[in-house]
């Protein structure tokens, strides 16, 4: 088989697979709308109690890591902000930090009237600062809770669109594509990507998502407060 591929323009089987499979998939997974589709699919699975990230990640991770590697190579040669791709795994992990529920947790911890949501917010705050959101997802619960369906399923997409626009407009440099470990607190993912603007954008996105969550949180909190009286 190796001899047959050596006689083709691909040169080897690995290059053939890369050209025929990886490049078309990269075209799908390396654009804004594909990322939005992947994200909504993952959040829908989360809504039904399935770990959506683990289910969807094997599809997009190889594609997005390829884009990150291209950014790393470009930054190594030309400096911060020289990345050629806006989209990548680093972009996704930085700007959809913790499933974008940190703002919701802060609302519960500091603005809830009901003891139910206030207690849950305070218990979940520290984990959420480190991107750990299972206490919120299963404690609220957000699973099968149609009160929070819109912000829970579509919040990450809003974060992606805002962040993409900020980078595409030049307000924030493209990320350097650095891989990070899970469990870093908010701000660290962005700082590792090489610019203070990315840190500011991550915080701005969190605030905006908190505003998106607010009307849904207020309704649920008022209902819970009435039941407690």
Q: Could you tell me what each predicted segment is?
A:
Residues 1-51, 180-229:
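Signature of multi-pass transmembrane helix bundles
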Residues 1-2, 29, 33, 37, ...:
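Hydrophobic faces of alpha-helical transmembrane segments in multi-pass integral membrane proteins
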Residues 5-14, 51, 110-113, 133-138, ...:
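Transmembrane helix-loop junctions in multi-pass membrane proteins
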Residues 5-14, 64-71, 168-176:
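Membrane-helix interface motif
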Residues 24-29, 117-125, 174-175:
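Short, amphipathic, aromatic/basic-enriched membrane-interface segments that mark the entry/exit
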Residues 40-53, 65-66, 130, 135:
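Transmembrane alpha-helix interface/packing and boundary motifs in multi-pass membrane proteins
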Residues 65-148, 152, 156:
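Helix-loop-helix junctions within the multi-pass membrane cores of secondary transporters/permeases
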Residues 72-78, 123-126, 137-229:
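Transmembrane alpha-helical segments and their short flanking loops
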């Amino acid at each position: 088989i190796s001899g047959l591929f050596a006689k083709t323009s691909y040169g080897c089987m690995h290059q053939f697979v890369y050209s025929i499979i990886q490049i078309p998939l990269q075209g799908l997974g390396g654009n804004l709308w594909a990322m939005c589709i992947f994200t909504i699919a993952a959040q829908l699975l989360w809504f039904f109690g399935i770990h959506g990230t683990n289910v969807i990640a094997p599809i997009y991770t190889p594609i997005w890591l390829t884009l990150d590697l291209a950014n790393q190579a470009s930054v190594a040669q030309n400096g911060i902000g020289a990345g050629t791709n806006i989209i990548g795994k680093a972009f996704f992990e930085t700007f959809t930090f913790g499933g974008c529920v940190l703002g919701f947790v802060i609302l519960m911890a500091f603005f809830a009237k009901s003891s139910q949501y206030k207690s849950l917010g305070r218990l979940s705050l520290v984990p959420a600062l480190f991107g750990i959101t299972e206490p919120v997802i299963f404690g609220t619960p957000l699973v099968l809770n149609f009160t929070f369906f819109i912000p829970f399923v579509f919040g990450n997409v809003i974060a992606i669109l805002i962040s993409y626009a900020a980078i595409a407009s030049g307000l924030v440099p493209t990320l350097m594509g650095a891989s990070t470990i899970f469990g870093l607190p908010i701000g660290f993912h962005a700082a590792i990507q090489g610019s203070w603007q990315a840190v500011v954008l991550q915080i701005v996105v969190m605030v905006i998502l908190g505003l998106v969550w607010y009307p849904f949180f207020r309704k649920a909190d008022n209902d819970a407060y009435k039941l407690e009286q």
